[in-house]
Amino acid sequence: MENNIYQIIAKYFEIDGVPCVMEMIHRLDNENLIDNDGRRILMDNLTGYKNELYRDPLTGVYNRRYYEDNIKDLNENAGVAMIDLDDFKLYNDFYGHNAGDMALETIVSAIKKCIRSSDKIIRLGGDEFLLVLPGIHSNIFNKKLQQIRTRIKEAKVDGYSKIRLSVSIGGVMTHNETIE
């Protein structure tokens, strides 16, 4: 089979009350895939769409859809932790939603400083994050969670000097079982 890329456009319409679908098929060539400067237009666009699909727009970490599509059925040895921002509703109610957003961004920044590039941070919603650290030893995993808690406690929320962050963290080790 050829390694070609095709664009297919389908249009529904009716002729004398009979439903029909017209399909237009177009084979994409290098002019459609690569611009004059040699950039890969289609692949760059697809990568951008994938990032929009799987990234939380506020924090930039993976989102719940990424978890559902890629992580929950993953079967491996990993440290898995749920991280929940304490008093998040209070920050939003007392200081406003911008303060809550800044608190979430601060937490993500603190977590990223403590983990490897192969580890995954997923914002499940609101102030809940899932952390997946594949192939980590349990002793190191426990130390990482303590390091994260300490780093978050010491973090400053830009523009909101009175906010003192703390998180609740629960962690388990998976042994050849799904993350879910």
Language model segments and positions:
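Per-ARNT-Sim (PAS) sensory domains and their PAS-associated C-terminal
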Residues: M1-Q7, D16-P19, S161-I163
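Short helix/loop segment flanking the catalytic signature motif in cyclic-nucleotide metabolism enzymes
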Residues: A103, L130-Q147
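Alpha-helical scaffold within the catalytic cores of cyclic-nucleotide enzymes
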Residues: V108-S109, I140-D158
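A short glycine-enriched loop-to-beta-strand structural element that forms part of the catalytic core
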Residues: V132-P134, Y160-E180
